[in-house]
Structure formats: structure tokens, C-alpha cells
Amino acid sequence: MAEIELKNISKSFASTEVIKSLDLSISNGEFITIVGPSGCGKSTLLRIIAGLENQSTGDVEIDGNVVNNTRASERDLAMVFQSYALYPHLTVQQNLMVPLKLRRLSFLERFPIIGWFMPNRRSKLDEVVSKVQAASETLQITHLLERKPGQLSGGQQQRVAVGRAMVREPVAFLMDEPLSNLDAGLRVHMRAEISELHRDLKTTFIYVTHDQAEALTMSDRMAVMMDGEILQLDTPHEIYNNPSTIRVAEFVGSPKINILKGEYDEKGNLKCFGIKITDSIKLAKKGNVSVGIRPEHMELVSSNEKKIFKGEIVYRENLGSDIFLHLTVNEGEQKIIVRSEPSNVINTAVGDQVWIRWDEQKIMVFDVDGNNMTTKYI
């Protein structure tokens, strides 16, 4: 296991700054995910940790040692890429043995014919085979050892790529969008497998993805990164329920959080479209605000209830277990999404006028600068 710390890391390509004075501490054995949209600098940051890219300023520390000038091959980190990079002419077993042979055997011991006569070669090879066997049993790919990559499915290739990193027994695993090439169903399955592998190995995992579902389901902590900066670093639960800014709130969650124009008046009432929705939220400043509410925290109700507003259904999105109703509110000026169980909206149709209520305890309020006014981030 390894503790990894990034101090004041920045990276520029010519005049373009892609990482801006970034600090990040990763604990021993932690599974941390760096999540953000394409182009935010997350893969560049991972390459800096790996030693494949040099930072412009700042320090990378592994277990308290500055490794700025340490070659990638000497940092004892294992990387799994989006492209599995398996040798197509080698069997699975041979693919798994390659990194161990390079590390355990000397140049002469790897040399054809001459190496066969080196005195320690056999014992070293036996150790390599033993480690490959152990890794293949952990990943449940023992029955695939004699196959070549072209005979494997995408999920099987992904497991072999992880196994090739695993046999090295690195101090940390670096994973750069390893599930991006898989279909949706297999991706869900592999998320569970990688999480289970982390629990078994108890090794530090740094995982980069643009897929928020991967970040939310697998991480001990997740770092939301945009425009070269980490906007929030916290547990998945906290980031989903207490986003520090409106940008984080809109990025995390599917469907996206509903953001409505609101006002906090002199009497301490929070209003949307001129309708009082709550007086239980106390804010430091009066004036215009943005009100956030997630689709699952809204519901359709009868028109005789209080603190509700009217909308028109413009689209029904049926996902089987859930139905997402796309509505226009405030005379069509804004759109929102309401998540509901199918049995609750079975009689609704596009064009219907409906009444909506939301859970007051789940309301988020953001100021004009996009900062969350209703959480610990005040």
C-alpha cells in the first residue's frame, strides 16, 4: 500500500494551463476516483502520478518520498488503461508473465538459449508461474490461461489487463477509464468486480473516469474535477447530497438536478415563481438565488395541497423500474424532471396538467456565484 500526496501540482502545454495548483492527499489502501468531463485534466494528473508526464510545478510524494525525478518504471505503480494493451500473439498466461519476467529475470536470464543455462533462472520462473496462478485464481481467469486475447470477450480482456498489473504487487493501482470499452451491462458487472478486488488486495486505487456512476458506486472518496481544478473532494454520499457548488450539483446525478430561479425574501420565505415553497431554510443573505431539487425528491400530488406548483408533461421516459416525467413549469419558461414509480403515474400522458410537490428537507439553495448556501460549505 502507499500514501500518495500531490502538492501544488500545475501543468501547462505551451500557454494552456490544464492543471492549476492542485493539492490532493490519498491515504493508504484508499479507493479514490477522479471524475470530471472530458478535457478537465484528470488523465493528465494520473500520468503525472505515474511518471509518464512531468508537472510544470509542484511535488509528487509516494510514502513521504518526493519522486519528481524518479522514472515511471521505478515508482512501483501499476497502470490499467482504457486500451488493454495485451500482446495478441501471446497467451493469457504469457501476457501475465511478461511484467514479472522483466522485473525478476536479468537480461542474460531472459536471453534465448543462453538464459536456459543460468543457475537461478528456473527458481525465478517457478516463482513467476506461482504468482500468475494466484492472480488468475483471484480474477477467476484460470480457464483462460491458454487462450490468446483475440479469443476473449471484452470483460475477459479487461480482467487479464488488471491481472497483468496485479501480479507485480505494486504499491498502488492507477486506472484510466478501464471500463469505457465495455457495454453497459458488462460495465455494471465489472464495477462490482473491481470493488471486490480492492477489498481483497487492500491496496491504494486511483481511478479516473468521466462516468459518475462508477465514481459513486466504487469510491471511498471522489474528487470532482473541472477546468484543471478539484471543485470538491468528499465521500460519494456527501458530494451527491451536499454539493459545494452548483457545478458539482449539476454534474453529479442522473438525471441532472433541477435548478429553478428563486428568491429569498425579507420575511425569510424561499419562493419559486412567486410561490412560497418553505420558510424553514434560513439564509444569511436576501435576494435572488438558484433552487436545486433532485428528480427523486419531487412527486405528483392532488391540487388541493399546499406549497405545490403546476406543470405540463411534455415527455414520459419509461425505464421500467422508474418513469421520468419531463415537465414545463412557470408557463413553459422552465423545464424540470420528476422521478416516479410507474404505479404512481400510470394514468398520466403527454399534455396532462399536473401538480408537483417537493421534499423541503432536500432543497438546496445556491447564491449568485453558484455556492451552496444550505450546507456546511457556507
What are these regions (language model features)?
Residues 4, 19-21:
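Conserved structural motif at the start of ABC-family nucleotide-binding domains
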Residues 35-37:
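The feature captures the beta-strand-to-loop junction immediately N-terminal to the Walker
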Residues 50:
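Helix-to-loop junction immediately C-terminal to a conserved catalytic motif
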Residues 56-59, 227:
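Conserved coupling/switch loops of ABC nucleotide-binding domains, chiefly the family-specific signature
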Residues 58-66:
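Conserved ABC transporter NBD signature motif
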Residues 91-247:
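ABC ATPase nucleotide-binding domains
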Residues 267-378:
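Non-catalytic connector elements of ABC transporters
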